[in-house]
């Protein structure tokens, strides 16, 4: 699984003894600037059998830099939610590279870094008279969206 390709979660769950608990946009992780950095993602996996994850990720220590005055993106992080022998749970930072062994019910959270921004936000505001630049996300419309929204209401 990579950060550049979105694999089908159903295939992942079929091939490996893992349950995908979360796969979402990491809002606010992109750098601030005239052209904001892209958002990272959050992926959470729960082991359904004893298993080993091999991690090879970057930008966990050093944040993705911005260019031409743009702000840096947020760094990524990899966390494991482990079960202790006394029944308690403990969060562990597993770093950017290495091996993580999980027992059934334990979880691995992968927060990918946000992208660095390009261009100074202050200069863009002065040049364009823009009060504030916000991320815009696609919103569904039309009959299919209305049908799906109706099905999810009750």
Model features per residue range: what roles?
Residues 1-154:
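Glycine/proline-enriched, intrinsically flexible loops and inter-domain linkers
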């Amino acid at each position: 699984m990579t950060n550049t390709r979105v694999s089908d979660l159903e295939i992942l769950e079929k091939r490996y003894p893992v349950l995908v608990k979360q796969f979402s946009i990491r809002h606010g992780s992109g750098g601030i600037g005239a052209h904001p950095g892209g958002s990272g993602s959050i992926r959470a996996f729960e082991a359904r059998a004893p298993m080993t994850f091999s991690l090879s990720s970057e930008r966990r220590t050093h944040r993705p830099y911005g260019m031409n005055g743009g702000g840096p993106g947020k760094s990524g992080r990899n966390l494991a939610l482990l079960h202790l022998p006394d029944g308690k749970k403990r969060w562990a930072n597993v770093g950017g590279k290495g091996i993580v062994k999980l027992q059934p019910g334990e979880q691995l959270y992968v927060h990918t870094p946000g992208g660095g921004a390009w261009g100074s936000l202050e200069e863009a505001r002065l040049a364009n008279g823009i009060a504030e630049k916000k991320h815009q996300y696609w919103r569904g419309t039309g009959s299919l969206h209305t049908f799906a929204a109706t099905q999810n209401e009750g």
